[in-house]
């Protein structure tokens, strides 16, 4: 709760609808990863080591078992927007604090990204995002949406540029 804190606990549908209202869209998973990496090839956009000054994650003040006890980012829960330095593209808060939804569906069964176009893959079943009604139900293997970036209550490993989470 606070004007400078990120919006949290938003469904994928609400995030998509907000973007549509603003005449925008959620980024694809490929677009998000390109943006967060900021032109780097390291584990995290700032390098390969975490000191606690790069983003908000489950650190020494976190009460969960997955905490990283050796570092502190200075926040027990969410941090005010802009509390950490930007990535090389000048983008703030791309990792940690709260997860970020992307457009893609997760295809567990077929491992879409092994067979997808290498440049700008659209993600499996993008047509489902503009369709409504029972005939639009995804296949058994495509039932999850993807979020990226990690959050204040996630391990530091989830801040990796390549990490992905999924939810129904």
Regions found by a protein language model. Give the residues of each.
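Short surface loop/edge beta-strand patches of beta-sandwich-type extracellular domains
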Residues: 168
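Functional-site microenvironments in short loops/helix caps that host divalent-cation chemistry
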Residues: 1-165
